[in-house]
Amino acid sequence: MNRQQFLIDAGLEVQTLEFWIEQQWLVPDESTQEISFSDTDVARAHLIRDLKGDFGVNDEGIDVILHLVDQLHGLRRAFEELHKDIASSPR
């Protein structure tokens, strides 16, 4: 989705989005002329907004939490691949 649609879906202001991209909390796809965002980016923006607004997490805390979330997703993918390999190997 384009930047304008992302801002609407994520409920963000332009300045907030620019700061979050600068902090690398959001990493949009810049492979085309216009940057684009995914549904995952929207979900991540909602998480950041909730952490900051509802829970009062500061910027350093957001960095730590997002790093841990990214590690968990990476481990999940690794376990899924391992499970596929085990399931497809002859017994």
Where are the model-predicted features located?
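Arg/Lys-rich, alpha-helical DNA-contact motif
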Residues: 2-8, 22-27, 31-91
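Short glycine/proline-centered loop/turn elements that form peptide/ligand docking sites
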Residues: 6, 12-19
